[in-house]
Structures are given as structure tokens and as C-alpha cells.
Regions:
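Distinct, well-ordered alpha-helical segments
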Residues: 33-44
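Switch I (G2) and immediately adjacent beta-strands of P-loop GTPase domains
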Residues: 18
């Protein structure tokens, strides 16, 4: 079942990549999470960038180094963290609890320190209603910054200061 399921996903990813490659020169990738269900090499074979999503609790950041090291080497292409949480994580409730001060800062630097070229957050602004109300963001529904917004801004300034070194 697992091999069948993996082939199904790879087939779908390849089908979508073929269509997108016809209409854009932008890099094409697919968001992945670290599970044992996929062949990451097969999934990324026709893609231009390796993308990874992670929503682990702050206590698991050390384990994320392994995931970054593994996925970054799947293909000799850019490695992007395309979804991670700015604060808490949740859909209808805040899963994994509160993030201690500094966790978002470390979560921003870690993938870059492990060879990542980009880190993106889910969500930029908190939802005013609907699904994922309990998901952290950079700004609340009124547009006010959370504590984690400053941590991300600090890392962004440091990325800018280290730009030449990080490009190597």
C-alpha cells in the first residue's frame, strides 16, 4: 500500500509539474513534510526546488536538523522551507503549546544554517474567521505585531548582514 500510495503522489506531482513548466519559468516544487510515506528522490525528480514544511514544537528543533540535512541533499537544487509556524500551530486549537522566547528566531536561522535558501511562514496575518483560527502568524487580525515578529525581523536583518557569506 505504501509503495502504491507513493507512486500515486509522485504521478500527481509530475503531472502538475509538467503543466506548470509549460506556462512558467518560475521554479516548480511541492510542499513536503517528513514522513516515511514518500520517496523524496522520486517526488522531486521533475521539480526545480526541494520544499519542506515543518510545524514541530520548539523542543523538536534539534531533530529538525536531521530533516533539513536529509531533504537538502535529495537533489542538487535550492532547498526552501516553504511553511513553518511563526508562533503556535493549530487548526481549531493551538497545538504543541506556547513557543518560548527565542524559539522562532532559532526556527528562522536553523534551516538557513543547514543550507536552506528561504524560510516562509504560515500565516503572515491571523485569520479573522474560518479555518486555522488557532494558527500563529506574524501579525494579528488587527495588523499588530506579535512578539515573534521581532524575532523574525532580527533574523532577517542578520541575513542581510551575512548576505555575501550566505550566497557561497
Amino acid at each position: 500500500w505504501t509503495r502504491f500510495h507513493c507512486r500515486n503522489i509522485v504521478s500527481y506531482v509530475n503531472e502538475q509539474a509538467e503543466v506548470l513548466h509549460q506556462y512558467t519559468k518560475a521554479p516548480v516544487g511541492t510542499d513536503m513534510m517528513a514522513t516515511n510515506l514518500l520517496s523524496y528522490e522520486e517526488t522531486n525528480r521533475q521539480l526545480d526546488v526541494v520544499q519542506y514544511n515543518h510545524y514541530e514544537p520548539a523542543a523538536e528543533l534539534g531533530r529538525m536538523s536531521f530533516a533539513y540535512d536529509f531533504l537538502r541533499t535529495v537533489k542538487d537544487k535550492p532547498f526552501w522551507v516553504t511553511e513553518t509556524q511563526a508562533g503556535w500551530n493549530g487548526s481549531t486549537f493551538a497545538e504543541f503549546g506556547y513557543r518560548p522566547a527565542g524559539a522562532c528566531y532559532a526556527n528562522t536561522w536553523l534551516p538557513v544554517a543547514r543550507g536552506g535558501e528561504m524560510v516562509e511562514y504560515w500565516h503572515f496575518r491571523a485569520h479573522p474567521n474560518g479555518h486555522e483560527l488557532a494558527h500563529g502568524a506574524l501579525f494579528n487580525t488587527a495588523g499588530r505585531a506579535y512578539r515573534v515578529t521581532g524575532e523574525i525581523a532580527r533574523a532577517a536583518k542578520e541575513f542581510e548582514a551575512c548576505r555575501d557569506l550566505l550566497r557561497r
